[in-house]
Amino acid sequence: MLTYETWEENDVSFSEEDETKGALSVLSWAYKEYKSEIVYACSFGVEGMVLLHLINQVNPSAKVVFLDTNVHFQETYELIQKVRERFPSLNIIEKQPKLTLDEQDKLHGDKLWESNPNLCCKIRKILPLEESLANEKAWISGLRREQSETRKHTKFINQDHRFQSIKVCPLIHWTWKEVWRYVYKHSLPYNPLHDVGYPSIGCEKCTLPVGEGGDSRDGRWAGKVKTECGLHYQ
């Protein structure tokens, strides 16, 4: 088994010359390699809808973790319910932070997402994912190279130093148009916020719509130097 510790033995390669640009092959390998010791960390963005559909074909009872920060858009929570109905066999886990919002306010002050967004992300996303990955050998992410400069070198299989795990990224070669073409082709549910200027959807407090011609992640932590929540640093 390929693990974080045995990374030097990595000789896995995949062709991207198929209908899913390698995604199905990558997922088939991942679930064969890790069996029950792999989880998909899903934010329920539009890429997530594609991955859930593909994963359901490979492993209908796969584990899916959603990092419920308690400050997501209502539309996101409603989408999760639709996904549960569409893919009833998937094991969707809504992972909560250890601190409630009230407890966080008492410890760190009101609106931590404004005063210290990095700490807020650590409490409400990074630490919960660490807990979710504690007993896993690998995890799946919907990263695409096209999304941003920080993601353009992502590979199908990555040694993830942040979580000392293997990170599997099946959609690295997909374009934004290809993602949407797949969603429409298979009549997949998606977050209606995508239709009103939100290409990337995170927490309600830190996500704004993006103007025409803007980068897909311009609406995340707008006005701040921050561009990533911290889950995807290599």
UniProtKB/Swiss-Prot annotation:
Entry EC number(s): 1.8.4.10
UniProt key word Protein transport: no
Positions of [4Fe-4S] cluster binding: C120, C121, C203, C206
Gene Ontology biological process: cysteine biosynthetic process; hydrogen sulfide biosynthetic process; sulfate assimilation, phosphoadenylyl sulfate reduction by phosphoadenylyl-sulfate reductase (thioredoxin)
Subcellular location per the Swiss-Prot or TrEMBL entry: Cytoplasm
Pathway(s) where this gene product acts: Sulfur metabolism; hydrogen sulfide biosynthesis; sulfite from sulfate
Pfam families (UniProt xref): PAPS_reduct (PF01507)
The protein's name: Adenosine 5'-phosphosulfate reductase
The encoding gene: cysH
